[in-house]
């Protein structure tokens, strides 16, 4: 992958040997990062198009950035389309149409590997799992949680883990509030519980009408035998099912379908996805694919479908509001990705399905309007940030750093990432820090340090972590981050914001000099009395300055800083909690791996061990009365 030619000259040189068959080509920039992936029925013809004169600005910009080019021959155009989709997903090239938010949808899982099956929320692949039944997908975790709550009210199946289930010797709160039949202490037998499992399965599969009819017959039978209390309970279940059915929006038009509506405004696109499973509306979610240059809705929808169904579960049919480019090839590629033989993608003209598509289109337009308002506001803020910090361009990626610790213990550093479209949580990073690492080998770099930082070094050039461990920890974070950026230059931030003061400026400058990097950065410290709105900004070669607390850009910077701070505290607490839980049991004389495992298995959790009485502790195999007293005393002291 080496060549002295670039741009159109490079493409001309590659045309000599380019084959006239189907395949995929990749364009790379000067850093050998993939910037575009394309497929072609005829590679030679497609590459020839890139040396024509009448190209749009996006294509011209892409060609100008191309320093290396590779192509792969495939057996058919469908294979080329499939390979193209996989490479786009893997490399996320900036000149391709991209589906940024591709996290998997959550499901409801009914576990079948236990005598008393558990209902729970599940996120991940379901095709290869055989330990349960899966219902969904749902558009959000909120939709799953709401449905699970309703199911618990109606059917009262357990939701606890096996460890918690096995540790019970009395009913938990779920039983008291009538959301569980407490099978853990045999308040219900296996046969009756199995009947409830059949009922909840029927409901989640959409057989609500048949279920209600069967329950009505059972209610009448119980009444005729004068089991009025049991009959009343089934009556309440029928009423609850009717209410949930009404609220869920059961559809007779579609049973198992994804409805997709694409709309466009000012070069921005929204694809609204409405999920229907077992005739029930499982929620809607808007996507905003990124696309550079001139594109069509047909092309956007094509790449959206290919990327979306690499991860999401396929329904029986996909209903769309717009034609799809290369529709037949797209169908074949999706079938191969999902290893199926049949797939329907339909564009309804009239009837019930057309009305559902129209509703989805209306929702898509509303979602796009809201997105554009937020996008415009973010653009204004980004322009202000560019001018405020003398950046060469409007920032695309801002990285915000903070750390959290207690006197150097349980230390973590974090990186939060934001851009034009808001926070990018997939790019968040956590750095586990060692408070014992000293900064050696930097003695030659200390001469130009800020005096505030320089005083933290001793005469041997070793960093004094007991005085300024916050500097030491941030230096660890930045060193690790810049090391990674050397490997991933395409993720270089436009700006770094550090939660720190003048001393941090010196640390950042020295570490960047060591790596021969020059990333714009600013340190943001709390003002007098740590009051919000009085923050101070520290930059190399500039006097410390503040901003009017009412300026939108100031409020935005506070939001960025607070997001990093919250993320740091959250991860610090998690680490501290894990360490404390581990050490509290491990430090008790007589508690080894086996007894600790027995305690956690019996009680189900560390909290349950802490809550246990001495009499409850001695019930655990291997725990004597004296050891139980020691455990109780130690845990309650800690």
Swiss-Prot record:
**Family matches, as InterPro entries:** GIY-YIG_endonuc (IPR000305), GIY-YIG_endonuc_sf (IPR035901), GIY-YIG_UvrC_Cho (IPR047296), Hlx-hairpin-Hlx_DNA-bd_motif (IPR003583), RuvA_2-like (IPR010994), UVR_dom (IPR001943), UVR_dom_sf (IPR036876), UvrABC_protein_C (IPR050066)
User: GIY-YIG domain location, by residue?
Assistant: 20-97
- Annotated keywords: Cytoplasm, DNA damage, DNA excision, DNA repair, Excision nuclease, SOS response
Q: Where is the UVR domain?
A: 209-244
**GO BP, one example?**
nucleotide-excision repair
SUPFAM superfamilies given in the database record: C-terminal UvrC-binding domain of UvrB (SSF46600), GIY-YIG endonuclease (SSF82771), RuvA domain 2-like (SSF47781)
* Annotated Gene Ontology cellular component terms: cytoplasm; excinuclease repair complex
User: What is the protein's major site of localization?
Assistant: cytoplasm
Task: Note whether Iron-sulfur occurs among the keywords.
Answer: no
Gene Ontology MF, one? DNA binding
* Superkingdom in the source lineage: Bacteria
* Complex formation: Interacts with UvrB in an incision complex.
The record ties this protein, via PANTHER family, to: UVRABC SYSTEM PROTEIN C (PTHR30562:SF1), UVRC/OXIDOREDUCTASE (PTHR30562)
Functionally, this protein is described as follows:
The UvrABC repair system catalyzes the recognition and processing of DNA lesions. UvrC both incises the 5' and 3' sides of the lesion. The N-terminal half is responsible for the 3' incision and the C-terminal half is responsible for the 5' incision.
The entry sums up its family as follows: Belongs to the UvrC family.
Q: What is the protein name for this chain? A: UvrABC system protein C
Which organism does this record belong to?
Answer: Rickettsia canadensis (strain McKiel)
What lineage does UniProt assign to this protein's organism?
Bacteria, Pseudomonadati, Pseudomonadota, Alphaproteobacteria, Rickettsiales
